[in-house]
From Swiss-Prot:
Its main location: membrane. Belongs to the PA-phosphatase related phosphoesterase family. PANTHER family: LIPID PHOSPHATE PHOSPHATASE, PHOSPHOLIPID PHOSPHATASE-RELATED PROTEIN TYPE 5. This is Phospholipid phosphatase-related protein type 5. The keyword Transferase does not apply. Induces filopodia formation and promotes neurite growth in a CDC42-independent manner; impedes neurite growth inhibitory-mediated axonal retraction. The gene is Plppr5. It is found in: Cell membrane. It is a multi-pass membrane protein. The lineage of its organism: Eukaryota, Metazoa, Chordata, Craniata, Vertebrata. InterPro entries: P_Acid_Pase_2/haloperoxi_sf, P_Acid_Pase_2/haloperoxidase, PA_PP_rel. Keywords: Cell membrane, Membrane, Transmembrane, Transmembrane helix. Pfam families: PAP2 (PF01569). GO terms for biological process: phospholipid metabolic process; positive regulation of filopodium assembly; positive regulation of neuron projection development. It comes from Mus musculus (Mouse).
Length: 321
């Protein structure tokens, strides 16, 4: 049972909580404040790429934000808690103590159960990635200021005052629009698609968790069906954004790339594909192997050494006799 100092555990926990709090605060500032100014992108007169009808507020969408955020936050929590509990109980029932993580003792009173440690670690990394995905998406939207397909329906530009006699005339500046400023600002933040990024991040993280953790017999078809179902829901979320004229294809594809990249990075590089800690014997074996020489050259005894050794034996025999 490994013993870890209380001060070390406390400092590591405090440092991770500071990072998590900073990530949440940055996501909050991106989402609910005007701290970061959106880039004002111009457009051509009567541009067909931005002349789609206004689909209505986000709450009227087939995948409203409340439903998307609830599923992205609730389903992974439920799946990971149930999965870790099932794996832990199965290891206890089969007495598979070799593959089970050890209980960590911190100080003289605190015991960290492997079930609690793995669950908190996987859920904490998932929450961090969820906020990181939101930050990446918001940063891209603020920097690019890409216009929504229904932008002109909200902008309501006065083409006569702007002198739009030709379709090739470029219009720039916020004063070109006469519509609702809040709706116009929201229509300038579409690249990459936040809904596509969050949905595919949750689906990818859960898919990799299910394929790496659940290894019971009889799940050869259950795992692919469940994983493909999750990825299909994320894919349909992106298609719905395009079908409702809320995002362009490029917005959705960029959102998919952001979500998948963050999920794969966290799973592979941070939680090590949801594997447990390696036993200490493995580290000792690697240390011994590291100290071994690259080549083993046999020692050749010279004739002079043989003569000297023979003289020593003769002298020792003479002293004894």
């Amino acid at each position: 049972m490994p013993l870890l100092p209380v001060a070390l555990i406390s400092s590591m926990l405090y440092f991770q909580m500071v990072i998590m709090a900073g990530t949440v605060m940055l996501a909050y500032y991106f989402e609910y404040t005007d701290t970061f100014t959106v880039n004002v992108q111009g457009f051509f007169c009567h541009d067909s790429a931005y002349r789609k009808p206004y689909p209505g507020p986000e709450d009227s969408s087939a995948v409203p934000p409340v439903l998307l955020y609830s599923l992205a936050a609730g389903v992974p929590v439920l799946v990971i808690i149930v999965g870790e509990t099932a794996v832990f109980c199965l290891q206890l029932a089969t007495r598979d103590f070799e593959n089970q993580e050890k209980t960590i003792l911190t100080g003289d009173c605190c015991y960290i159960n492997p079930l609690v440690r793995r669950t908190v670690r996987f859920l904490g990394i998932y929450a961090f990635g969820l906020f990181a995905t939101d930050i990446f998406v918001n940063a891209g939207q603020v920097v690019t200021g890409n216009l929504a397909p229904h932008f002109l329906a909200l902008c309501k530009p006065n083409y006569t005052a702007l002198g739009c006699q030709q379709y090739t005339q470029f219009i720039s500046g916020e004063e070109a629009c006469t519509g609702n400023p809040d709706l116009i600002m929201r229509a300038r933040k579409t690249f990459p698609s936040k809904e596509a990024a969050l949905s595919v991040y949750a689906a990818t993280y859960l898919t990799m968790y299910i394929t790496s953790t659940i290894k019971a017999k009889g799940t050869r078809l259950a795992k692919p069906v469940l994983c493909l179902g999750l990825m299909c829901l994320a894919f349909l979320t992106g298609l719905n954004r395009v079908a409702e004229y809320r995002n362009h294809w490029s917005d959705v594809i960029a959102g998919f790339l952001v979500g998948i990249s963050i999920a794969v990075f966290l799973v592979v590089c941070v939680v090590n594909n949801f594997k447990g800690r390696q036993p200490e014997n493995g580290h000792i074996h690697r240390d011994n192997v590291a100290r071994m020489p690259m080549t083993n050259i046999p020692r050749v005894e010279s004739p002079l050494e043989k003569v000297t050794s023979l003289q020593n034996h003769v002298t020792a025999f003479a002293e004894v006799t």
